[in-house]
Swiss-Prot record:
Residues forming coiled coils: none
UniProt keyword Ribonucleoprotein present: no
Protein name as it appears in the record: NAD(P)H-quinone oxidoreductase chain 4, chloroplastic
One of the record's GO molecular function terms: ubiquinone binding
Localization (cell): Plastid, Chloroplast thylakoid membrane
Topology of this chain in the membrane: Multi-pass membrane protein
Entry similarity comment: Belongs to the complex I subunit 4 family.
EC number, as in UniProt: 7.1.1.-
Gene: ndhD
Gene Ontology process terms (BP): ATP synthesis coupled electron transport; electron transport coupled proton transport
Organism expressing this protein natively: Chlorokybus atmophyticus (Soil alga)
Main location: plastid
């Protein structure tokens, strides 16, 4: 069993199983959705088996490495591997995608295409996290974009064409920078290779490393998203089906944070030391700007989308903190937001299914008719505003303390950034609790009075939210259950950065 290509299996199984969907006789989509759910569950079980029996979280090096020559002329290898940075996100992908498939249960129009695209996204997202060949990484990055575009275009709202076009333009332009920077890294020096392990060992001139860093940063800032490249996200979330939103918030945004750590931070350390303060400033802008913009949103999903932009600011600050505590907090924030974001978008979608509106002014008094939905929405909103005892609180606290204790920045800079972080933390509960008040409190609006009778959440909705809330509470109460998976890897990354920083300072002293 040890010799099986486990990573290849979990990457290819969803999309290969999805290719069988057209041959399944099913006009109403009922069989297809059970089939897709079964594929999702089976792949997630395989992931948990690999994690439980073949992954050693104490080992920071790559594990379960598979390396097959795919296109020899291009030096293109099917090279996969997992470590502490990728394993938690692979688990998150399997978990959230399976729940998103269950969340998409009401979808009946073009069900075969819909569930095939969901499974294709599943493969692409896992592929991004386990790829150890830069060209394969780019291929998986692109594979994941096409299903999102089609899911938006076919099952989106009234402005779906605009949202889908904006999404594909932003992400495609970002992808060009990945390709250009990746090719430059591969062809620099005497050895031509796309193997990330070999690319990490190459020594680049500082000016070239800075250019490479900027190229990758643009691409990953689009995906994260970071200000000012974030504007595609509210439009996409506002128009996408809520199961697609679960995948976008739960997994797709994490690809940007993961790639920043894997490539920019670990493979281009000299440039990262230069750009780290810039990342922190952008992170603070993310937190405050998105929180303030969220106040002006009338659409529930757009308001939640801006909260996602705000929360991703903490990831940038953690990555820029240059401390293990800060980086560990950034990874935990990605995991935490993946769960919380998916839950909020699912609840927004189920609320829309009943009220047929996402405009907060058209809601009101919904809590009386839908107390279970209200209770779940309140719980997930409290998780999003980082209530103590929930995962978001631990993640933000780790980032906060990690940056505050960093020896790489002056006291004045840390004081200003910490103060601004505090403002963002204060703004978050204001706009989230305001959203709850508008949608659920007060008397029932005239708009809803003229609609059909509201039906509260059923067993399916309660099951999905319970599955998402349990790990949110579990991590909040006992963070070690998550941090132990990746802590050895983040320590190694930060130690490598500190060695590079020490060498750089010695070189600067000698030159003076």
């Amino acid at each position: 069993m040890m010799n099986l290509p486990w990573l290849t299996i979990i990457v290819l199984f969803p999309i290969l199983a999805g290719l069988l969907i057209p041959f399944i006789p099913d006009e109403k989509g009922k069989t297809i959705r059970w089939y897709a759910l079964g594929v999702g569950i089976l792949d997630f079980l395989l992931i948990t088996y690999i994690f439980g029996y073949h992954y050693n979280f104490k080992d920071p090096s790559l594990q379960l490495v598979e390396d097959y020559s795919w296109v020899p002329l291009l030096r293109f290898h099917w090279c996969l591997g997992v470590d502490g940075l990728s394993m938690p996100l692979v688990l998150l992908t399997g978990f959230v995608t399976t729940l998103a498939i269950l969340g998409a249960w009401p979808v009946k129009r073009n069900a075969k295409l819909f569930y095939f695209l969901m499974l294709a996204m599943y493969s692409g997202q896992i592929g991004v996290f386990v790829s150890q060949d830069l060209l394969l990484f780019f291929f998986m990055w692109e594979l994941e974009l096409i299903p999102v575009y089609l899911l938006l275009l076919v099952w989106g709202g009234k402005k779906r064409l605009y949202a889908a076009t904006k999404f594909i333009l932003y992400t495609a332009i970002g992808s060009i920078f990945i390709l250009l920077a990746g090719l430059t890294m591969a062809f620099y020096g005497d050895i031509v290779t796309f193997d990330m392990r070999a690319l990490k060992l190459k020594e680049y001139p500082l000016n070239l490393e800075i250019l490479l860093y900027i190229g990758f940063l643009i691409a990953y800032a689009v995906k994260l998203p970071a200000f000012p490249l974030h504007t595609w996200l509210p439009d996409t979330h506002g128009e996408a089906h809520y199961s697609t939103c679960m995948l976008l918030a739960g997994i797709l945004l994490k690809m940007g944070g993961y790639a920043l750590i894997r490539i920019n931070m670990d493979m281009l350390p000299n440039a990262h030391l230069i750009f780290a303060p810039f990342l922190i400033i952008i992170g603070v802008i993310n937190i405050i700007y998105a929180a303030l913009t969220s106040f002006a949103q009338r659409n529930m999903k757009r308001k939640i989308a801006y909260s996602s932009v705000s929360h991703m600011g903490f990831v940038l600050i953690g990555i820029g903190s240059l401390t293990n505590l800060g980086l560990s907090g950034a990874v935990l924030q990605m995991i935490s937001h993946g769960l919380i974001g998916a839950s909020l978008f699912f609840l927004a979608g189920t609320t829309y299914d009943r009220t047929r509106t996402l405009i907060l002014e058209d809601m009101g008094g919904v809590a009386k008719k839908m107390p279970k939905t209200f209770a779940m929405f309140t719980t997930c909103s409290l998780a999003s505003l980082a209530l103590p005892g929930m995962s978001g609180f631990v993640a933000e606290l780790m980032v906060f303390l990690g940056f505050a204790t960093s020896a790489s920045y002056s006291f004045e800079f840390k004081a200003i950034i910490t103060f601004l972080e505090g403002i963002g933390i204060i703004l978050t509960p204001i706009y989230l609790l305001s959203m709850l008040r508008q949608a659920f409190y007060g008397s029932e609006s005239f708009t809803l009075l003229n609609k059909r009778k509201l039906i509260d959440a059923g067993p399916r909705e309660i099951f999905v939210i319970t599955c998402l809330v349990l790990p949110i509470l579990g991590i909040g109460i006992y963070p070690k259950m998550a941090t132990q998976i990746y802590n050895s890897k983040t320590e190694t990354v930060v130690q490598h950065l500190q060695q590079v920083q020490s060498t750089f300072e010695k070189t600067s002293t000698l030159s003076l």
